[in-house]
A protein has these predicted regions:
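Alpha-helix boundary recognition
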Residues: 12, 20, 55-58
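Short, aromatic-enriched amphipathic alpha-helices that serve as compact interaction elements
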Residues: 1-15
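Hydrophobic pocket/interface hotspot
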Residues: 7, 19-20, 27, 46, ...
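Short, flexible, glycine/charge-rich loop motifs used to bind or transfer phosphoryl groups or to couple energy/partner
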Residues: 17-18, 66
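A solvent-exposed, acidic/Ser-Thr-rich amphipathic alpha-helical stretch
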Residues: 25-68
Length: 110
């Protein structure tokens, strides 16, 4: 499986630990979709922060994705749900380490 396929699978299953383990220790997620949902953008730095952030979001049902579809080796489209507000989004793996861990991923409105 590619990094983007693993990302979609972890997000759909709300597997915050599995999601965090896809990232390098200094991995980064930049999520720009939230501005469309009248929330602050997410800029999450580091595997541990990614784990804690999504544990909170999934646990309190403040974030989920629906209808994930991998469109190529680095991108996937899905519906991002921010506490009941849905946005069509596209995630892009921008950079990976030599051992295949995600170093930088962005999520933008589609």
């Amino acid at each position: 499986m590619t990094a983007i396929e693993k990302y979609v699978e972890a997000m759909e299953n709300k597997d915050y630990a599995g999601l965090a383990n896809l990232f390098s220790p200094d991995g980064i997620i930049n999520d720009y979709c939230t501005s469309s949902a009248a929330q602050n953008e997410y800029h999450i730095y580091g595997r541990e922060a990614i784990n804690m952030f999504f544990r909170n979001k999934f646990g309190f049902r403040k974030y989920s994705i629906l209808d994930g579809e991998v469109v190529n080796s680095t991108q996937a489209e899905f519906i991002a749900n921010f506490g009941g507000y849905n946005i069509k989004a596209i995630a892009t793996v921008r950079e990976v380490t030599e051992d295949g861990l995600i170093k930088r991923l962005t999520v933008r409105p589609k």
